[in-house]
Structure formats: structure tokens, C-alpha cells
Amino acid sequence: MPHAVAVFNMRNVKGDVTFTNKGANVLVEAIFTKLPVGEHGFHIHMAGDLRGEGCKGACAHFHKGSRPGTHGGLPGSKRPRHTGDLGNISGTGTYKYTIRDLSAEELFGRSLIVHEDADDLGLGNEADSLTTGHSGRRIACAIIGRTMESC
């Protein structure tokens, strides 16, 4: 049973993302039914404030821990990464991730963002590669909230 959900219902992006606690980890399942062509960076951001052009109020990528973290690849990657770095999505379909040492409840009120461009996973030569993956502007955003099953 999912504990948290984020719903994308924008003109260019449609989909549901659920977060289910599995022991000390959280299973993330994203199902997109509409997505622009190409690869898009996909991240959990710190805040659920979607005000402002391009969801600027969502702040930076979410990172659990005392250090700010460095941008990186998918959950489970051996390279350093922000807790909220989910790599790239491309096309409609289902994407699944397991994020270790995190609960769905820690994500309540945060946001999910789909970016315009591919995430370089922190491997690029651009100035923002180690903070945002040089993934471009924010094209869709959704707040992560409690599911009715978790009430």
C-alpha cells in the first residue's frame, strides 16, 4: 500500500508517482502516460512550494544528511549523489527506484520535478553539473503528499 503520492496533471506531463515503505527503504514507482519526447532529468526537490515561474519555490534537490551532497546518478549508484536524484526518464512507461534509508513520510510536502533536458548525472563539464545535472528548466512539478490509505 503506497504511503505517499505525487500527481502530474499538466498539459505536457501526466503521471502518478507512488512511494511505499519497504523496511528501512522507500520504493518509488512512477507511471507516466504523457511526457515530451527525449530524456528528462527527474528529481525530488526540497520544498513543495510550486509558486513562481518554473516551480522555482521547490528549491534545490532533496538530500538527507548533514552535508549538502553532490549531484549524481540513480539510487543504488556507488557514486556520491543527492538523495533525491532519480536520473532520467524518457517516454511513457513505468520507472522503479529503491531509495535506501528513507521513508515516505520524510518526503511529505516535498516536490517532484521533471526537467526539460537530460540529466548528465554529475559527469558533465558544465558549471551546474554537480548541483543540478545540467538538466535545464523545470517543465512539470508535483507535490508529494499523504495517500488516503495512510491516513
What do these predicted regions represent?
Residues M1-E39, I44-C151:
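N-terminal leader/targeting pre-sequences
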